[in-house]
Amino acid sequence: MNIYLVGGAVRDSLLNLPVTEQDWVVVGATPEQLLKLGYQQVGKDFPVFLHPVSHEEYALARTERKSGQGYTGFTCYAAPDVTLEDDLLRRDLTVNAIARSADGEFIDPYHGKQDLENRVLRHVSDAFGEDPLRVLRVARFAARFAYLGFTIAPETMSLMSNMAQSGELSALTPERVWKETEKALKTQSPHVYFQVLRDCGALAVLFPEIERLFGVPAPEKWHPEIDTGIHTLMTLAIAAQLSPEVDIRFAALCHDLGKGLTPKEHWPHHHGHGPAGVKLVEQLCQRLRIPNPVRDLAKLVAEYHDLIHTVNKLRPETLLKLFNAIDVWRKPERLEQMIMTSEADARGRTGFENNPYPQGDYLRAAFQIANGVSIQEVVASGLQGLAIRDELQRRRQQALAEWKQTQETPLI
C-alpha cells in the first residue's frame, strides 16, 4: 500500500501558495484494509475514507468510465490493481494531476509541472469531454489564477467549445452551476470566469441574460467601451477590487441586465432599463436557485443604480424613498453595498477606471442626517400607529431639506 498527496495541495505548493486542504490517494489497498486501520468510509459512489487522526480525505485509486449523461453518469472502478498513473489520468487538468510521495518525490506523468511553469491550464485526456462540470471548473481556475498569468490551452478551449455545443451542459443541476459560479465570484478576477464561458459558448447556455448584453451599444459619451457586455465585465472587475462580498460582485454582474431588453430601434439609449432588469434578475436567480440575500441586493442595484449616480440632484423626498426602498433603516449594511456597486458601475468604463465617486460620500452624509432624527422624540410626542411613521418621515425629509441647502452642488 502506497499513499500519495494529490491535486490542489500539490499544485498550490508548487506555486508557493498557501495549502488549505490536502487530498490523498491510496494505491494497492482495499476498503477492508483501510477500515481495519481505523479509517472511516464516507464515499457512497466511490471509496473515500477519513483519516482516523487528521480527518483528511483518502481515496482509493480509481478509474472512471462514462456510463450516462452529465457529470454523475460515471461507473467507478477501485481496486488494488489500479495504478497511480491510472488515477491521475482521470483528473481534469495536468496541473491537478501531479502526485507527491511520502519521501517528497513528484510523480508527474502528464507534465503538469511544465504546464505550471508555462502558466497553462490543459486537459489531461479526452475523457475531460465526458464531464460537463469541467467547463465551469476550468473557467473558475482561469479566474482564480489569472493574476499569475495563467491561460487556457487552445486545444482545451476547443474541447470546451465542443462540449458547450453538444448540449451536455444542460445536464448540470442549478445547484452545481451556482456552486461553481459562487466560487468563481470569490476569486481575484471573477470577470475572467464569465469571459471564458463566453469564449467557449457556455455563457449563452447557462447565463443567456448576460450573453444577450454583448453587442448591445450604449452612448459613447458615457460609455467609451460602447458594448454593454464589455462594460458589465469591467464593472465586475472593479467590484472585485472594492469588495470580497459575493453579493456585491453578483449585483455588479447583473446591474444592467435590463439593457438586453431594449428594442434595437431605441439603441444606444436604454430608458427604464433599471426596473426592466429586476425581472431578469429574478428569473436568473430562480433558475439557478441563488440564495435570497444575493438575489435581493442584485434586484435593488438593478433598479436604483442610475438614481445613485445623480444622488446630489435628488429632492429630499426622493432621497427618503431611496432609503426606504433599500430598507437601510433595518439593514444599514445595504448603504455601502449599494454605493460600492454603483461606484463599480461608474468606474467600469474605459478611461474612468481610477475616477473618484463623490456620490458615495454624498449618500453617506445624507443617510447620517436622516438617521440622526430621533425616533424616541417622535414617539414621546404622543402620536400613535401610522402617525408615528408619517411624522418620522416628515422630520427626516425636513432635516434633509435643511442639510441640502448647506451643500454646494458638486459636478457629478
UniProtKB/Swiss-Prot annotation:
InterPro entries the record matches: CCA_bact, HD/PDEase_dom, HD_domain, NT_sf, PolA_pol_head_dom, PolyA_RNA-bd, tRNA_CCA-adding_enzyme
GO biological process: RNA repair; tRNA 3'-terminal CCA addition
UniProt-listed SMART domains: HDc
Segments forming domain HD: 228-329
UniProt keyword Nucleotide-binding present: yes
Signal peptide stretch: none
Residues that coordinate or bind CTP: G8, R11, R91, R137, R140
Similarity section: Belongs to the tRNA nucleotidyltransferase/poly(A) polymerase family. Bacterial CCA-adding enzyme type 1 subfamily.
NCBIfam families: PRK10885.1
Entries under PANTHER family matching the protein: MULTIFUNCTIONAL CCA PROTEIN
Oligomer and partners: Monomer. Can also form homodimers and oligomers.
Domain note: Comprises two domains: an N-terminal domain containing the nucleotidyltransferase activity and a C-terminal HD domain associated with both phosphodiesterase and phosphatase activities.
Any further remark recorded for this protein: A single active site specifically recognizes both ATP and CTP and is responsible for their addition.
Task of the protein: Catalyzes the addition and repair of the essential 3'-terminal CCA sequence in tRNAs without using a nucleic acid template. Adds these three nucleotides in the order of C, C, and A to the tRNA nucleotide-73, using CTP and ATP as substrates and producing inorganic pyrophosphate. tRNA 3'-terminal CCA addition is required both for tRNA processing and repair. Also involved in tRNA surveillance by mediating tandem CCA addition to generate a CCACCA at the 3' terminus of unstable tRNAs. While stable tRNAs receive only 3'-terminal CCA, unstable tRNAs are marked with CCACCA and rapidly degraded.
Protein's recorded name: Multifunctional CCA protein
